[in-house]
Amino acid sequence: MLKIKRLSIRKFIHTFLIFVDKIFSMTINQVKNLFSEELQSLYTSAECEELFFIFCEKILNLNKIDIRSQLENSISAENQKGFLKIISILKEGKPYQQILGETYFYGNQFFVDENVLIPRPETEELIELIENKLSHLKQEKLKILDVGTGSGCISISLAKIFPNAEVSSIDISEKALNIAQKNADFHKVKINFIQKDYLTGKLDEIYDIIVSNPPYIDVLEREEISHSVKNFEPNIALFAPENRVLAFYEKIAKDSENHLKKGGSVFLEINQKLGKETLQLFQDVLTKSELVKDLSENDRFVIGEK
């Protein structure tokens, strides 16, 4: 009799939990609406929708087509909890790429965390510029230097474009280099990662290409930078030394005199407000140099040839 009662109680509890789960479970469409309602102060409606799809793929393992056809389907309590946690973190301003732990750059996946800058579309334009300008050198045994490598997205992309090149990458941050090495291992490319303070250190090699997207934001521009960027991405990778906004470009120009081969190239991403000033640093060092605009028509790159 006691055994029967126990079985009945267990069955009742099981049935009750299923009933509660059905009452309080959310549909995929309700999650979609929640993304819009909770994040509208930080993102546009289109961005909210895109974030919804990104995290549906991550949590539910569904693509956009599947999601749209299953909007009225309920999700489990565990998945509901996962979505609510993500929305809460997004509301704090944390970039979604850091929540995912990955992003895409130039068509390839890269791991990212709070120790590296999240690669920007403008930097993809820099890679495209290099690939187009130096397409005739793709099979050559080049020596390439990437200054301030961060996640390694530039150096790894170039190692894939120039498979016979010897690529070296400098960064002051050991934690950033750990992520860069993880990305290099993932893409099965060999990069010579060097931890040093580039501004005070010396170079030992002579290179065919020097490329950099260094810290170039003036500390006086801090208030212009979005909360999510300055509070969640490494400031050391964003802001130039105080009162020396062109410090990295000055050092690269100096190194181009003795550590860039004759006929070698320089490719730099720059502060759009300091295009002419940055270009001027290289006009006496390189035989050819020019200021190149990005797709938004901002002065974004300085490129040149020795």
What are these regions (language model features)?
Residues 84-162, 167, 172-182, 303:
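SAM-dependent Rossmann-like transferase core, predominantly class I methyltransferases
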Residues 23-100:
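N-terminal auxiliary segments of SAM/dcSAM-dependent transferases
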Residues 164-165, 172-306:
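S-adenosylmethionine
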